[in-house]
């Protein structure tokens, strides 16, 4: 029986996938401590979008969060963060001195391992950052970024087992120092067959004892199958998550994968009862956070227009903020062409952001009318060399609109010449704002820009979306506005016309103005469908199956004939119930004396 290790990605990737990375530190530390007690030894705790989100939305410092996590787990647990090569944890690529500062600061604040990837798989972008991670005394996990391609696109030779193994050979030839190798599929679109063949080939290429880790999401519904294929191919460790931030756009749940491995030659070797308890605690802690419905859904369209789980929910949160969520189906549809014409870079941050920004522009302004800044610079080569040559017409449009010539120069050299990047430039910004010029503050300014400076000045806002906030937003509107908003948000859904009609019927029914004379009449109304109801301000999804509901009409009460010498009711003594419940029968009439035993 082979034991398969796992890394719990709940506290970074799970938060990013399900809550748009907007979670307070104090709300997850108890679950982190409980997971350690249950036996988890590896955690992804920060980096990626969770670095900026703490400053942008949570009114917190990412370095303080790392310190708190290390204090909770103790000295021996592996705490891992995610880095984007030359971008480190910023959305723009950085100069060499900031890349080096990133590694030294994360070591200082309790991190054990940095997973280091480049979405374009330009090995030059992994070389310098990997060396800095190694020099800082951290473990360097070098990454092969994976992605599934839409049908009929495999002839490009990108994102095939041979392509990935060639990239691995480039890493080995470049002599980049590494402690382990990860295969990361942020969109969850790589097929199980490609996963198996790739990891099987990598196992043959790598020195004996090299740890291979596999990362995927369940966005397209293939997470369990791909994890098992990775294990069969020779992976030593897989990335898993815990409810409520598991499944759908997030990673496969620990308990789900434990169940899949039962009866095979593999095991996670966990006490499942302990993890049931930890997940129950975690669910309770996360209850107040609003989780958008798309976060937990399997979306088959993602296989054709790859969007990472972490980016999908982060972008839908922002689209909600800007009242553009109704455009999402068309944006996702337009992503297919954007990926193909952009050169097939893996759909993972920051490239996934470039894809969705360009797809959004194509949706809003017309196809290829406007080339967005990030996408344009990418196809022109300013972030590295894409896996395939971008579309010539798109490159021409980018050149004309951005006024920048195509380049094959090393990104680090370009950035080192940029006067608005680097330690000196950001020190000057801090000095101008009267902010202490510490290494941490320099890095925050470099990676978070104006919002980072604002945070350091105490000017930050809470951008977390709680269930109570959503409930208030809905309650503040009239029923007609709620129905109209629901129609607009779901106008592209299959069968939605029928559901909308039912909703409108239910919302528009008002009690009659006056009693209706005549016998009681029962009317059968159809209520099948999915609805959201609110109990104490918390939304709950409710499904009504086909059946009938009784809708009694009001019946006029016949006049009461005045009785002669009607007896006065007994004053009585209140009898409080021992506990809350339902009244199922009444043994006596009003005014009668209650006897013992009744």
Regions found by a protein language model. Name each.
Residues 6, 14, 35, 116, ...:
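Conserved, mostly hydrophobic/aromatic
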Residues 98, 159, 163-166, 220-235:
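Catalytic cores of alpha/beta
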Residues 36-54, 296-301, 310-556:
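Terminal or standalone catalytic/regulatory effector modules within metabolic enzymes
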Residues 578, 584-593:
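Short histidine-centered loop motifs in beta-beta connectors
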Residues 1-18, 66:
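N-terminal amphipathic alpha-helix/helix-capping segment at the start of soluble metabolic enzymes
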Residues 116-119, 185, 233-252:
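Glycine-rich phosphate-binding active-site loops on the catalytic face of alpha/beta enzymes
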Residues 42, 47-166, 187-190:
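Active-site beta->alpha loop and helix N-cap motifs at the rims of alpha/beta catalytic domains
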Residues 5-13, 41-45, 77-84, 112-115, ...:
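Hydrophobic faces of well-ordered beta-strands that scaffold small-molecule active sites
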